[in-house]
C-alpha cells in the first residue's frame, strides 16, 4: 500500500484493508467535504479501477463510490487543494485535501487508470478549467508517455476488460484471461473470435466486445454460425463507430436483420478514421433497405474508397433486388475504389447492371468476383452482354470469375469468351460456368471460342446437360493450350453406351497425350460405374495428370482394385478423390496396400461415405485400411511438412518470446528507476529521464516491428515468376534425366541379353525385370519436383535467416539502449543519495579488542575468493590434482594460514598485557574459543579430554534429550554470536565414523540396557583413555547419566553426551581431580571390557602437552609418531555411521578436537608467573613421573617429551566442538543460525524428529566478551541437579 503525507493510523488502515478485501487499495488519502470541514474528515481509498469515500469512524461505511470510467472531467485547484469530479452517477463531487501533493497523487492515479482503458486519451481532455497550467505541466512531466508504458498482453485488453467488469458490476471471467494470455498473445494472433467464448452469456460477450473498442492489438473480429443477441450487437456497433484499428469485421450467419445493417451504415458513415478493410455480412437476412443504406454510407464516406478491399454480402436473398438497380450499392461500386474481393452470390443481383457498375469502378483492381446464383438480365437486351465484354476488356488482375447457376444465354457466353480472348493482360483465370444450362448451344459456342481464350487456365462445365455433345467438346478442350484444370461432371447423361464409351476413350486419350497441358480432371457425380475403368486404366501411362476426382461414380470394389493397380505404377498423381463409390472394406484395403508402394501421392481425402458403410459390416478391416492409408499419406508429406514448419517456427520460438519477455522486464525496471528518481532531480536527472523514455519507446517499437519482419520473411517476393522459371528449368533437367535413365536401361538390357540369353527367355524372370524397370521409371518424374521443393525450402530458410538476424540486431540495440538508460538513472540516484559517515573508532580499553581484529576476522583467517581460485588453478596445473583432492589441499592451506597468523599474533603480543586481553587475542588468532562453561548444577568445570572415547567408539548419538550447562543470564545477554561465514568454513573439519566391527545385524543388547557386556576390538579411543583407578566402581546408571531420556521408546539405541568426553583426552592436576571427586563412569557396559589394552603413555603425554600450550621440538621420531597416530585416527575413522559429506577434508590432529581446560580463574596464569599455575605444573609433573615409573617405561626411540617452559604462558586452546560447524544433514532441515554444530547421521538410521532449541551455550561468549565470572566450586551430584532436557551441549535442541 502506497504511503501518503497524511497521517492515517495503522488501526484504520487495517480496518480499511479488511473492509475492502479481496480488493486492495493502492492509495489512501485523507480528505473532507468543503461543507463539512476538516473536523469531519474522510478517507478516499483509490483502488485499481474504483474509488471509495469512507467515513473515518468505526465501523466503516461508504459515503459514495464511483468508477474511474464514470469520470467525465476533473477540475483541480491549488489554493485550497481541491478537486471537482464530473460523474455520470453524481452531479458533482468536490473534495478538499490537506496539501497539494495529495492532490497530485490523486490526479496521477486516476489519469493513469483512464489511460490504460483509453490509450489515445490526453490529459487536456480530462482536466478542465480552472486547473492551473503549472499543475497540468507537472502532471504531464510525471505522467509516463503512452510509448513508455510496457504494454500488457494484447495491448492491455485484459485491463480494459477488468475495468469494464468493475464498471458494470459483472464478474471477471478467468477463462477469457487465459485465452488472451495463452493463445492470442503467445501465438501473436490478432483475430478475436467470438465463437471461442460462445458458451458464455450474452453480457460476458458484450463486455469482451466493448473491450475491443479502444484496443490497439486486435485487428479482426469474427462471428460465424452463432446468433448474436441485442446486447452484443449494440457493442459491435459501438466498436465499429469508435475503433480506428479494426480492419476486418466478419459476421456470417449471425441472424442479423435489416435494422442492424441500417445502424451499421450510420456508424460507418460518421467514422472518418475507420481502418476497415474487410466487411462480411453473408448468410444473414438483410433486406433491400438495409443494403441501400449500406451502399450510401460506403459511397458517402470517402475513406472506404481507399481502404475497403474485401466485401462479402452473399447469401442474402433479395438484398439486391429490382429496387437496387438504380442506386444503393451499385453507386459505391461505380466509384473508383480498391475492391479486390467481391462476393454477391445469391443476392438476386442483375449481372448486366453489376458489370456496368464494375466497368467504371474497380475493374482494374478486382481479383475475385463471385456472382453465382444471380440473374443475368431482367429483360432481353444487348446492353448486358456489351457491359460484360467491357468489364472483361478493362480488367487487369482478375483470377476468379464465378457465374455458376446464372442461366447464361448464348450471346452472354459468346461475349464472355470473346472478352477473354481479346484481353491478353490477364492469365490463370478460373471460370465457373457450372449449372448454367448451356446445353448443346452453349457447347457449340465453347467449341468455337475456347481455343482462343488464352487467359483461361481452369474451366468448370459441370451440370450443363451436354450429353452426346461431350464428344466434340472434349476434342475442343484438347486443342486448348492453356486449360490445365477441367471439370466435366454430371454431363454424361448419354443413353447410348457406345457414345458414352467414345466420350470416355477420348478423355482417356486426352489424359495420355503428351502435348495436352491438362493437369486436373473431375468427372464427379457422373454415375459412370464400370465406365470409369476406362479412365482408371489410363492412369498407368499418363504423363501430366496430377489430380483426379472420380467421386460419385459407383465404381465398387472392382473399380477400387483397378485404382490400386494404377496407383502402384503411377508417379504423377498428387491428389485423388474417390468418395461415394460403394466401396467395401476390401476395396479400401486394396488401395491402402497399393499406397505402400506409392511415394508420390500427397492428398487423398478420406472417403467418409464409403468408410461409414464399410465400418458397419467389417469394422476391424475398415479401421486397419484407414490407418494404413493415413500412415502412407503422412509418410509422403513428411518432407514437405518439416521443410515448411521448421524454418517458420524456429525464429518465432527463439526470438519473439524471449526477446519480448526480456524487453518488457527491462522496461519495467527502467520505469521503476524513473519513478524513484522523481521530478526534482535537476537538469541532469531530467535528461536521464528523457533518454530513458526514448529507450523504452524504441524497445517497444522493436517488438512491434518483429511480426512485420516475420511476415516479410515468410511471404516470398516474386513467388510466381520464380516458380515459373524454376519449373521450366527443372523440366529440362527432368527430360535429361529421363533420357539418361532410358539409355541406361537399354544398355543394361543389351548387356544382360548378351551375357544371359537363356535367362531372358524365362517368362517369370522377364516379367520381374519389367516390373523393376517400370518402378524405376518414375524416378525422373520425381526428381524435378523434389528439386523444386528443395529450392523453395532453401530460399525460405535464407529469407527467414536474414529476417531473424535483422530482428535480433534491432532487439539487441534496443536492449543496449535500455541498459544504458538504467545505468544513467542508477548513477543519478546514487548522486542524490545522502552520504553516511562511518562512526568514529572508540579508544581501546584494557580488556577490549581492536576493531580490526573483531571486524576483520574472516579476512584474517581466510583468503579472498580470488586468491583461492588462483591457488586452485596453480595446484591443478602443477600436480594435475583431481577436484576432490584439491579441496583437501585448499583446506590444509587454510589451516596453515591459521597457525601462521596465530604464531605471528602470539609473538607480537606484549608481555605486560592483562590476562583477559591476552586470551582474547589468542582467541582471535586461533578462531575464537570461548571460555569453557561450567557444568549445570554441580559447579565443576568441563574436563579437557571430554568426548574422545565415543569419538572412536562404535556407538551413535541418538537420544533426543541432551544435557547442557546453564548459562548466567547476565553473560548470555552480552554474548556476541560467531560470524556465520566463520562457522561455515570451520564446519567441515571433522568426519565422525563408526568402526567396521560394529556393522552387521544389531543384537538385542542395544535395546536392553541391562544385558551383559561382550568383548570388542580396542580402538584408538581406548588407547587414549586414562587407566581405571582402583576403588572407582561402576554405577548402573552411569551408562546414561544425565542424558537418559524419560521415554523408554527413545532408548532403543544408546547415545553419548559430551560429559563422557571430559574424562578421556587430558589428565587434570591432582587438585582438580580432588575437586572433582569420584564420578560415575560414563562408559556404557558394551564399552567396558576386561580385555582393554593399556593406553599409550607417550600419546597421553603428547596430547596433554599440546592442550596446555607447550610447543615441542621437531624431530624425526616425533614425525614418525605423529604419522603413526594419524594413521590410527584414519583407520578408526575409515568405517563409521556418521560421515561428513566433505570426504576430501584432510585429517586434522587431535589438538583441534578438544575443549579449553577450564574457565576457572584459579587455573589461569597471572602476571609475572605467580598464582596457582606453578602448583599445577608441579603437581602435574609429579603425577607423570610416578605414573612413568609405575608402568616401567623403557628407553624411547626418539627424544622424549620436552619439559615445559618455565615462563608462564597462557595455554593455547583450540576451537571447541560447539563452535565447529559440521556439514548439515539435509534430513535435519535448515541449519540453526545460532547453533553451528550439527552431526550428520548415518544413512542407515531412521529419521529422527527435528530438534530446535535456543542458541548453544558454547556461543555464549563472543569475540569481545569478557571472561565469565567464577562459579561456585562445590560439587553437586547429578541426582540432585538433573540436567535440562531442553538443551544439548553439542548443539542439539529441545525434544519435539
Swiss-Prot record:
Gene: Carmil2
Main function: Cell membrane-cytoskeleton-associated protein that plays a role in the regulation of actin polymerization at the barbed end of actin filaments. Prevents F-actin heterodimeric capping protein (CP) activity at the leading edges of migrating cells, and hence generates uncapped barbed ends and enhances actin polymerization. Plays a role in cell protrusion formations; involved in cell polarity, lamellipodial assembly, membrane ruffling and macropinosome formations. Involved as well in cell migration and invadopodia formation during wound healing.
LRR repeats: 63-87, 88-110, 248-271, 273-296, 305-328, 363-386, 395-415, 426-448, 453-477, 480-506, 515-538, 542-565, 570-594, 598-621, 836-859
Protein name: Capping protein, Arp2/3 and myosin-I linker protein 2
Main subcellular location: cytoplasm
Record-linked PANTHER family: CAPPING PROTEIN, ARP2_3 AND MYOSIN-I LINKER PROTEIN 2, LEUCINE-RICH REPEAT, ISOFORM F-RELATED
Keywords: Cell membrane, Cell projection, Cytoplasm, Cytoskeleton, Leucine-rich repeat, Membrane, Methylation, Phosphoprotein, Repeat
Omega-N-methylarginine: residues carrying this PTM: 1191
InterPro entries found in the cross-reference section: CARMIL_C, CARMIL_PH, Leu-rich_rpt, LRR_dom_sf, PH-like_dom_sf, PP1-Reg/Actin-Interact_Protein
Phosphoserine PTM sites in chain numbering: 1008, 1134, 1203, 1281
Compositionally biased region (Polar residues): 1176-1185
UniProt GO MF annotations: phospholipid binding; protein-containing complex binding
A Pfam cross-reference name: CARMIL_C
Renumbered residue ranges of the record's region Tropomodulin-like: 507-601
Post-translational modification Phosphothreonine, affected residues: 1145
Membrane topology type: Peripheral membrane protein
Protein's UniProt keywords contain Cytoplasm: yes
Residue span of region Necessary for localization at the cell membrane: 975-1002
